[in-house]
Amino acid sequence: MYLLDTNILSELRRPKPHGAVLAWLEGVADTDLYLSAVTVGEIQAGIEITRRQDAAKAAEIEAWLDAVVETRHVLPMDGRVFREWARLMHGKPDTLIEDAMIAATARVHGLTVVTRNIRDFQSFGVPLLDPFKTE
């Protein structure tokens, strides 16, 4: 089972998503795909930045995100995940907080993180997959 990183979800929003990503997704059951609430928050933050420049575009992306949240398994940042996040962050002041939260979610739920940014997650001890390199 897989936890999609923010960059993978963003890729799917592109007019022409990368072929390798689409091919990989075709081989995975929807029931095996999960999102972290952190990813939803990161996308929403991008929407808010866009809203200041182009309200119509922001509304379009927000409607897409609403549909994603309604149709995908979104895993919360609960007590178990926050405790794992604290373990991952301990002694790593240069670690990106959001990446550590996504990794903690994956560790607690036994998921593989699907990301283009493998290097960002290597120190967290979670299984990783880069669908851009699966062609």
Q: What positions do the PLM features span?
A:
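Residues that scaffold the ATP/ADP-binding catalytic core of kinase and kinase-like folds
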Residues: 11-12, 24, 46, 84-85, ...
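Short loop->beta-strand "edge-of-pocket" segments that line small-molecule binding or catalytic clefts
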Residues: 2, 29-34, 68-75, 112
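Short secondary-structure boundary/capping segments
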Residues: 24-27, 65-66, 73, 103-105, ...
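A generic structural signal for short hydrophobic patches within well-formed alpha-helices
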Residues: 9, 40-43, 82, 121
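Acidic active-site catalytic centers that drive phospho-/nucleotidyl reactions
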Residues: 5, 42, 99, 117-120
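Active-site neighborhoods of divalent-metal-dependent phosphate/nucleic-acid chemistry enzymes
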Residues: 45-48, 53, 59, 71-116
